[in-house]
Amino acid sequence: MDKELDVSDLEPPEPLERILDAIMELRPGQRLAVSHRRLPYPLFDMLRRMGHRYETTGEEGRYRILIWPSGE
C-alpha cells in the first residue's frame, strides 16, 4: 500500500523535510505518493543519490510524485 503525503500547502523547506522524513519510514515494498504544488527539482537529485526512483504526473500547481527504492 502506498503512503500518502500532501505538502501542497507548506512553504519551503518544509515540503522537502517532510518528504525526506517520510521516505525514511517506508517499509519494504511501500511507495510514497506526494501531492505537491510544484516540481521539487532539488529533491529529484537527492532521490537519485539515495538510490530511489520517482515518477511525476500532473500539471502546474497540482503534481503527484511517486517515490520508491530503485530495487523494487
What is each residue range found by the language model?
Residues 1-26:
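An N-terminal amphipathic alpha-helical segment
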Residues 2-3, 49-50, 71:
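Intrinsically disordered, low-complexity terminal tails/loops enriched in metal-binding residues
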Residues 25, 45, 56-58:
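Sterically constrained small-residue positions within well-ordered secondary structures
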Residues 33-53:
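Short, structured protein-protein interaction patches enriched in aromatics and acidic/basic residues
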Residues 55-72:
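C-terminal edge-of-domain segments
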